[in-house]
């Protein structure tokens, strides 16, 4: 009886191995499902990007507004009679040389006022 139980247990393990660790086992199925989800996410991002680019292409083909906007912002073009004004924030002043130390006999150097 003990031999039959041991034989059945070994047979059960032999059957379970391909199910869990084999070529088409659960671990491989889980990995493939994970890859499919990642690819679906990438595909969705690319679809959104393609839709945006398609809209830009249609704008450039159909209307002059998009062309004018690109010419203004990317190339700095202006219409006749317009004046281009650009406000630039001033850069912080940077001293080229460090300040000189006070002379040795001055009140600032001795600590007396």
Curated annotation (Swiss-Prot):
Please give the coiled-coil regions recorded for this protein.
34-63
Cytoplasmic topological domain ranges are: 1-3
Read off the InterPro entries from this record: Cell_div_FtsB, FtsL/DivIC
Q: Which residues lie on this side of the membrane: Periplasmic?
A: 22-113
Which biological process annotations from GO are given for this protein?
FtsZ-dependent cytokinesis
Pfam families under this entry?
DivIC
Q: How does it sit in the membrane?
A: Single-pass type II membrane protein
User: For this UniProt entry, which residues form the secretion signal?
Assistant: none
| Disordered: region residues | 93-113
Where would you find this protein in the cell? Cell inner membrane
Gene Ontology CC: one annotated term: plasma membrane
List residues traversing the bilayer: 4-21
* Superkingdom per UniProt: Bacteria
Instruction: Identify the keywords attached in UniProt to this record, alphabetized.
Output: Cell cycle, Cell division, Cell inner membrane, Cell membrane, Coiled coil, Membrane, Transmembrane, Transmembrane helix
Say if the entry is tagged with keyword Mitochondrion: no
The role this protein plays is:
Essential cell division protein. May link together the upstream cell division proteins, which are predominantly cytoplasmic, with the downstream cell division proteins, which are predominantly periplasmic.
Quaternary structure and interacting proteins, as annotated: Part of a complex composed of FtsB, FtsL and FtsQ.
Indicate the family of this protein.
Answer: Belongs to the FtsB family.
**Protein name as it appears in the record:** Cell division protein FtsB
Traced from the root, the source organism's taxonomic lineage reads: Bacteria, Pseudomonadati, Pseudomonadota, Betaproteobacteria, Burkholderiales
């Amino acid at each position: 009886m003990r031999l039959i139980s041991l034989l059945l247990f070994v047979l059960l393990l032999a059957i379970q191995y391909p199910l869990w660790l084999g070529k088409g086992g659960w671990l491989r199925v889980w990995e493939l499902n994970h890859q499919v989800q990642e690819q679906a996410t990438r595909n969705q991002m690319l679809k959104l990007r393609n839709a945006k680019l398609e809209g830009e292409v249609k704008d450039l083909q159909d209307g002059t507004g998009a062309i004018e906007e690109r010419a203004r912002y990317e190339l700095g073009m202006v219409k006749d009679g317009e004046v281009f004004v650009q406000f630039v924030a001033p850069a912080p002043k940077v001293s080229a040389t460090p300040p000189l130390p006070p002379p040795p006999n001055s009140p600032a150097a001795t600590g007396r006022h």
